[in-house]
Amino acid sequence: MEEIKPASASCVSKEKPSKVSDLISRFEGGSSLSNYSDLKKESAVNLNAPRTPGRHGLTTTPQQKLLSQHLPQRQGNDTDKTQGAQTCVANGVMAAQNQMECEEEKAATLSSDTSIQASEPLLDTHIVNGERDETATAPASPTTDSCDGNASDSSYRTPGIGPVLPLEERGAETETKVQERENGESPLELEQLDQHHEMKETNEQKLHKIANELLLTERAYVNRLDLLDQVFYCKLLEEANRGSFPAEMVNKIFSNISSINAFHSKFLLPELEKRMQEWETTPRIGDILQKLAPFLKMYGEYVKGFDNAMELVKNMTERIPQFKSVVEEIQKQKICGSLTLQHHMLEPVQRIPRYEMLLKDYLRKLPPDSLDWNDAKKSLEIISTAASHSNSAIRKMENLKKLLEIYEMLGEEEDIVNPSNELIKEGQILKLAARNTSAQERYLFLFNNMLLYCVPKFSLVGSKFTVRTRVGIDGMKIVETQNEEYPHTFQVSGKERTLELQASSAQDKEEWIKALQETIDAFHQRHETFRNAIAKDNDIHSEVSTAELGKRAPRWIRDNEVTMCMKCKEPFNALTRRRHHCRACGYVVCWKCSDYKAQLEYDGGKLSKVCKDCYQIISGFTDSEEKKRKGILEIESAEVSGNSVVCSFLQYMEKSKPWQKAWCVIPKQDPLVLYMYGAPQDVRAQATIPLLGYVVDEMPRSADLPHSFKLTQSKSVHSFAADSEELKQKWLKVILLAVTGETPGGPNEHPATLDDHPEPKKKSEC
């Protein structure tokens, strides 16, 4: 019996017919007997060499694996035929001139292998690359290829199963592997080296891609800076120079945007463009970004004033029509991309974190031994520090945006848009009625300092909720209750109201209790810090006794040590309640609590700003003096009515609220402000309206009261109605001057004074 080696290749080509024909024509035209023996050696090496997946996609087909696993060994001494026969397989392609010889020898061995055929499994040929499916009805017999001593599969093999290398490349690869084995190297080591080479090339490509992304985003960023600097800023400054609004406000909004634009457009962007052109010789960006470090101070100034800028844009858009008109006109242009001014102003804040992200990705791909490693790492450290400040500003902007959304959902009636307010949690919940314990649908907005308890509105447009109760976090307690009929209940007890609430599930209940308790704890921690600061300050100031106030310079409390006025405890904000220092005790107080002046001995007897308490101790005061120094709403009605341009009772209505009678006064000392009191002798005004910028509508609607008129500015609408047409015209004469900024002189005889009306006690209640 002959010994048959396991089959590892087929005489049938795995290439498509076109490639087979091409290879056959090559062999027919250029093969010789001398080359044929060489071909035999190469093919024998190829067939015996292990075929592992590699760069060129060499794979072993399922049929080849099956044959190699199940072919039996043929015992015998007849090896002359297998050793002396010519090879009929060359790299998996049948040579045309030897095909007939191979077929004859296969036929000769077919009859002697019947027993072997019976033991072989059936092989099916499936559709490959769209070819038809042919299933062998007879056992597929592995026959001995007399050309090289290997068994070949006689079943039908579909072309195109895997890529086949050209003969020259296949032979070269085989010789390399043989040489490796002779040198003691394994094919796996070569494969790892190849993969390492490919990885190196891949990293280089990724580094170039990151650098190119930096360049592309920098171009887009410079375009945004041009939009802010050359369009928004310039157009608004032109309008301000016409006298529509102060130019100083425009400068505060845009801060140092011109300097930032100049740096990026004239330095950083040209440097990046030049470097990308020279990337083949200088593949690095760390040295360029390191030059960015000294200019990050510009971003610090921009980010620091960002909150104030956003507040200014909001207020000026609402109150100044000319400002709003210019901004909206620019926002309609294609260059804005349907985005608002506030959105574009956020671009510089977001840019620094973008640099940080790209640099981190760049360093991950950069080899540690690269020349750019140290520069890139140093740049990342500097930029990461600046990015932390930018991220803080982004979070504040996102929080402010959310507050505006809630403000609109509540019908713009709750004053919640304040940088000090932070939304913690919101969601739907059920409220258990006290009388019949029925469950009613409610909605909660939890902030860091209050809980808004709201009732849903079932309307397609407008506000979605009505605020039923505002419960302060100060003094709030959370109690977990047990109710068999109503599960998942808990109680929120505050100074303003106690609510028994029902969550939708045990998890929802747990989340609400956790959020509420953490908010309460954080609130108390802030106030504890505040109280400790005061106590510590009192210890430090123990040397400055009451008798020494004004005689000895105090230690000033730092601005960042407090978040609220140390006298009235109202929270500070950048726009309406700024920080001031009392020159006598050093406390940080608001404008209202520091609206006093006293002579301080340690400062040479100069009049200096002091708080209310220090003013009382240093100067002493009378009741009348105290009244003169009260806030704008605390000015007594009798004071302004006796020295006013016009004053009388008017019917007043705001938004959808009902009409109510109010004592209205425009004083001579403040002729551009309308004061409204409940009665002529009230010591505090209910509201004030700065008249500058309002639009006056003299024509009442049919639904309004007779002799009515309206004051409109942005979303604020105030409706008034006089008792007569004559009184209405007297008011309009004064108001029409005030809304344009002109100061009415005011006649000696007031158009409508207290003498024109009986005492309030004789009239109906307001």
Swiss-Prot record:
It is found in: Cytoplasm, Cytoskeleton; Cell projection, Filopodium. Expressed in different tissues, including brain, cerebellum, peripheral nerve, skeletal muscle, heart, uterus, placenta and testis. The keyword Metal-binding applies. Residues 206-393 form the DH domain. Residues 422-521, 643-740 form the PH domain. Pfam families: FYVE, PH, RhoGEF. GO terms for molecular function: actin binding; guanyl-nucleotide exchange factor activity; small GTPase binding; zinc ion binding. Zn(2+) 2 binds at C582, C585, C611, C614. SMART domains: FYVE, PH, RhoGEF. Residues 1-20, 46-83, 134-188, 742-766 are annotated as: Disordered. One of its GO terms (biological process) is regulation of small GTPase mediated signal transduction. Residues 1-150 are annotated as: Actin filament-binding. A zinc finger (FYVE-type) spans 559-619. Its main location: cytoplasm. Homooligomer. This is FYVE, RhoGEF and PH domain-containing protein 4. It comes from Homo sapiens (Human). The lineage of its organism: Eukaryota, Metazoa, Chordata, Craniata, Vertebrata.
